Design a protein with these regions (language model features):
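Bacterial N-terminal signal peptides
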Residues: 14-27
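N-terminal leader/targeting segments and the immediate start of mature chains
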Residues: 25-67, 78-81, 219-224
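An acidic-aromatic
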Residues: 72-120, 190-191
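Gly/Pro-enriched, hydrophobic low-complexity segments
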Residues: 135-223
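N-terminal secretory signal peptides that target proteins for export/translocation
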Residues: 1-11
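Flexible, surface-exposed loop/linker segments and immediately adjacent secondary-structure boundaries
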Residues: 113-149
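Beta-turn initiation residues at beta-strand->coil junctions
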Residues: 58-60, 86, 102-103, 181-184
């Protein structure tokens, strides 16, 4: 897989991990308007969703750039599993193994994410990372790109690292994220803006596994 593909796909997968982190890892709070309670209600909304499907646009911009790059994609999630579709790649993750297919190269890379990668794909590790490594702050209310009222929550790391801050915009009444922005120390700002989200999309577990029968001529590169 070419390096630029890896970077773009990895950014998407990282956002998926962050999404799963905040929706799976956090406990349900009371109904006061503070950061942890807002995140708690978002967790409850996801746990009760019975699977979700979402369309999104991802924007990436480097410091000093007047214009960045963007692309659209879709994602389906159930528990810690997801299937991600972007213009350049398809990714399946069944909670343990990840398959990334790049059509231009006609190849599939198979990995079992470990270490730093698991911090983005394993909800339990993400939960521990959030609880131990970030401080959540309620920043007020705003209007989401879809016109709905939303809460703004900002996460800042307790220790210096690659991430400077994570900004979450969570719809006030549905409790689902409308926008997630991650700012890195290298000046890159990446935003996923969710345009459509449906609940009750309870796909079977096999939906989150790469099926070689659907891609008979593809080259499978097992990196496990």
């Amino acid at each position: 897989m070419r390096r630029e593909y890896k970077v773009r796909v990895w950014r998407c997968i990282a956002f998926v991990g962050l999404f799963l982190c905040f929706l799976l890892g956090l406990g349900v709070g009371a109904y006061a308007q503070n950061a942890n309670d807002i995140l708690g209600k978002a967790a409850a909304a996801y746990e009760n969703s019975n699977g979700i499907s979402a369309s999104f646009t991802m924007f990436t911009r480097s410091a000093g750039q007047n214009a960045g790059e963007s692309f659209e994609g879709t994602i389906q999630m159930k528990g810690d599993k997801f299937t991600l579709v972007t213009p350049e790649a398809l990714t399946w993750f069944n909670g343990t193994t990840q398959w990334t297919y790049v059509e231009r190269n006609d190849e599939v890379n198979v990995t079992n994410p470990t270490g730093e990668e698991l911090q983005f794909t394993n909800p339990a590790l993400l939960f521990n990372s959030y609880k131990k490594g970030f401080t959540a702050a309620y920043k007020g209310e705003s209007t989401a790109p879809n016109g709905k009222a939303a809460y703004d929550v900002e996460l800042t790391p307790k220790k210096k690292g690659d991430i400077v801050k994570v900004e979450l915009q969570i719809e006030k009444y549905s409790n689902f994220p409308a926008r997630i922005t991650v700012t890195s120390k290298n000046g890159v700002s990446s935003t996923i803006q969710i345009s459509q989200l449906k609940t009750g999309i309870n796909q079977p577990d096999r939906f989150f596994v790469f099926n070689e029968g659907d891609y008979p001529d593809v080259e499978v590169i097992d990196l496990r």
